Amino acid sequence: IELMPIGFGTAMRRVSPDDILSALRERWPDLAPTDERRGNGPAHYYKSDLLLGRIGFIDAVSHKFCADCNRVRLTSTGQLKPCLCYADSADLRTLIRGGCTDDELREALKISIYNKPRAHCFDTDAAVTERHAMSQIGG
């Protein structure tokens, strides 16, 4: 999983997935991409005849997959975050504690998911609005 530049990740040196793949190919020269899918996640996989398993990469920063992202996060404070890059969220806790109906909750979920950004902003530090650490967000 590629380090995302949020929270403490902003101060850490990132290593590109391409550099990691190059290092892995020094050990397993036949490491090649596969079309294999596991679940509905964003990982893409590599295989080698010298390995029993697969090596998966989730490289959201270097190789944006935002348009196909099917992930949202629910924080411990009840905030539904459609994207890790932005501070935007839907306050489900207040909605639920206020006695919302199932239909109202479903509608809030639909709106949040429908409004997921088409791309993240991690390549422009000034555009990143999320200031919480991953541990505060739920990652």
Language-model features: locations:
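Radical SAM enzyme core and accessory elements
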Residues: 63-139
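Short capping micro-motif at the N-terminus of alpha-helices
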Residues: 55-57, 82-83
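Radical SAM enzyme [4Fe-4S]-AdoMet core and its adjacent flexible, acidic
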Residues: 1-54, 60
